[in-house]
A protein has these predicted regions:
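Intrinsically disordered, low-complexity acidic Ser/Thr-rich regulatory segments
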Residues: 1-80, 90
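Bacterial C-terminal helix-turn-helix
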Residues: 1-23, 27-28, 36, 43-44, ...
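C-terminal boundary/linker segments immediately following FHA domains
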Residues: 2-21, 58, 91-104, 108-158
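Nucleotide-binding/hydrolysis machinery
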Residues: 91, 197-204, 279-289, 297-404, ...
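Conserved RecA-like P-loop NTPase ATPase core
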Residues: 165, 187, 209, 223, ...
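Dynamic helix-loop-helix/coil hinge segments at AAA+ ATPase domain boundaries and subdomain interfaces
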Residues: 143-167, 217, 363, 417
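Conserved catalytic/switch belt of AAA+ P-loop NTPases
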Residues: 228, 261-285, 293-303
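Conserved post-Walker A coupling segment in P-loop NTPases
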Residues: 168-233, 243-259, 287, 324-329, ...
């Protein structure tokens, strides 16, 4: 079978937007993603579809195999910190019940350890088994398969909804359609645009323009170019960035910040593929694919008179949402690997303490992938000791404030604690009373980093008023 038609691709995008609004039916089985192992970043993330599964077991073994027997799935981990009987997921209508099967190190759900014999129903959660993190999602909407990064062989995403978006976007890019990428700041819209350019097969380069970075008169010259003598200082012809993207892709980042006067000229380029340089009387034909990106609500800008309705209708017809990082936690393993490949030590030379990796997986990432990148690269530099030695990233190396790194505290009555955690909780409460609520002093007494103690207080439901 060939690729879907343009009409079928458009229907796919419309269906996805309906699903995101909650009106579309769940069209995929639940998924369980092995996100990342703290001790071995070279292990690739993997996704398991739980189609027809009534029970899922995760346990330690040598093979690292996956076995399906009837309605039961067994995932075997080569993780020495997991137990030979560890995690059980049991289907319960539209959710799964999580149980620990008597493991040595326990099982945690969203950073909270399960008590003995506790049965916790969840739909979407981060699960800890030994030193390996999983992400459970049920129900799932979107596509089973995602495009791969041709440079690494890794999938671009393990999130079903984002998989659907990228698959449709790739088909449209190969047919030279103009596209609009939407999403919060830092979600990776430019990364998506560069991938779309690579898969489009266009022979020219990708030229990126930040529409918010330049004042109006400079932006016009940058985009459209000028002829010699067009204005004072124009000593020679300049083709401009639109023409520089000939047979390639023009990325207009932050298009919502483009001045109104330039929007009319841009519309002419998009509709007729012709550009008139400053000081010129003739229009020059151009062959460019236009990808725009914005973190703004363009329809709201239209209502305010700050964005042209006709430009939105033309460029915004094929709108591709890039989800925030907090909505696709199953991608954190892929992104961590992608970012840390850039450091000299490589993936083989870096591992994480569990508290640090747990913080990364549970953090809400308000600044998205851009923030993750900043945090990881800074953590590597802070954790680096001697040349050639392995890097071990702990929570003290993560440049996140305590309020960012720790989840909100819960009441003790809402938490089921193991005997070990009960002892630890009592000790921290006693130390807080002894040191009059000084967390730094408690951290010194426990020989732990202050940020780790703050996270323990949140996990164990300790409020300062208890002291």
């Amino acid at each position: 079978m060939g690729e879907p038609s343009d009409e079928e691709t458009l229907d796919t995008l419309k269906s996805e937007r309906s699903s995101q609004r909650g009106s579309g039916p769940p069209d995929l089985p639940p998924s369980l993603v092995k996100v990342v192992c703290a001790d071995d970043l070279q292990q690739s993330p993997s996704r398991h579809w739980l189609e027809g599964c009534e029970e899922v077991r995760v346990l330690r073994g040598r093979s690292g195999a996956v076995r399906q027997e009837g309605h039961s799935l067994t995932i075997v981990l080569a993780d020495r910190y997991a137990s030979v009987r560890h995690l059980l997921l049991r289907r319960a209508q539209d959710a799964f019940v999580v149980l620990d099967e008597g493991s040595t190190n326990g099982t945690s759900v969203d950073g909270r350890r399960l008590a003995a014999a506790e049965e916790r129903p969840v739909q979407t959660a981060v699960l800890e088994v030994g030193h390996t993190f999983f992400h459970l999602r049920t129900p799932a909407r979107g596509a089973r398969d995602a495009p791969t990064d041709e440079r690494t062989g890794d999938p671009l995403t393990l999130n079903p909804e984002f998989s659907l978006t990228l698959s449709a976007a790739g088909r449209l890019a190969r047919r030279a359609h103009d596209l609009l990428l939407t999403g919060e700041s830092g979600v990776g819209k430019e990364v998506v645009a560069r991938w779309l350019h690579r898969v489009s097969g266009r022979q020219g380069t990708l030229v990126a323009v930040n529409c918010a970075a330049l004042p109006e008169h400079l932006l016009e010259d940058e985009l459209f170019g000028h002829l010699k003598g067009a204005f004072s200082g124009a000593h020679s012809d300049r083709p401009g960035l639109i023409r520089a993207a000939e047979q390639g892709t023009l990325l207009l980042d932050e298009i919502g910040d483009m001045p109104l006067s330039l929007q009319a000229k841009l519309l002419r380029v998009i509709e007729d593929r012709r550009v008139r340089p400053l000081g010129g009387e003739r229009e020059v034909p151009v062959d460019v694919q236009v990808i725009a990106a914005t973190n703004r609500d363009l329809q709201a800008l239209v209502a305010e008179g700050r964005f042209r309705q006709d430009l939105l209708a033309r460029q915004g017809l094929l709108r591709l949402p890039v989800p925030p990082l907090r909505a696709r936690r199953e991608d954190l393993g892929l992104l961590i690997r992608q970012i840390l490949r850039e450091v000299p030590e490589g993936l083989a030379g870096i591992r994480f303490e569990m508290d640090a990796l747990r913080t990364l997986l549970l953090h809400d990432w308000p600044l998205n992938v851009r923030e993750l990148r900043r945090v990881l690269l800074a953590a590597v530099d802070l954790a680096r000791t001697e040349e050639g030695k392995a890097i071990v990233i702990g929570p003290q190396h993560l440049p996140l404030t305590a309020s960012e790194a720790a989840p909100p505290p819960r009441r003790a009555a809402d938490i089921s604690l193991s005997a070990e955690d009960q002892v630890l909780r009592t000790r921290i409460v006693e130390l807080l009373a002894e040191h009059r609520g000084n967390v730094a002093a408690v951290a010194r007494a426990l020989a732990r980093p202050r940020t780790q103690v703050q996270r323990l207080m949140a996990r164990l439901g300790i409020q300062r008023r208890e002291t």
